[in-house]
């Protein structure tokens, strides 16, 4: 795999955003990590994750997205 270069914005409270070519994007982890523990995966500015939920809230809530499209529980159950 080619080396990935990111522009990372880190706020004083610890919140972090990863960008590539001006878009939220990260291949090796969440592109957004909020100080409260929430994590959001993005590729090319779209919520996207194939190996788990694209949104993981610190309180345990989770949402699955592929290429920016939210997957319903029915689709998730059919895929498992």
Role assignments for model-derived ranges:
Residues 1-80:
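Glycine/tyrosine- and acidic-biased, solvent-exposed loop/turn segments at the edges of beta-strands
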């Amino acid at each position: 795999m080619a080396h990935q270069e990111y522009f990372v914005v880190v706020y004083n409270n610890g919140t972090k955003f990863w960008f590539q070519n001006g878009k939220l994007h990260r291949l090796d982890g969440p592109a957004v990590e909020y100080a409260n523990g929430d994590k959001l995966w993005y590729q090319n500015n779209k919520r996207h994750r194939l190996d788990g939920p694209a949104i993981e809230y610190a309180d345990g809530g989770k949402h699955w997205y592929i290429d920016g499209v939210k997957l319903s529980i029915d689709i998730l159950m059919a895929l498992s």
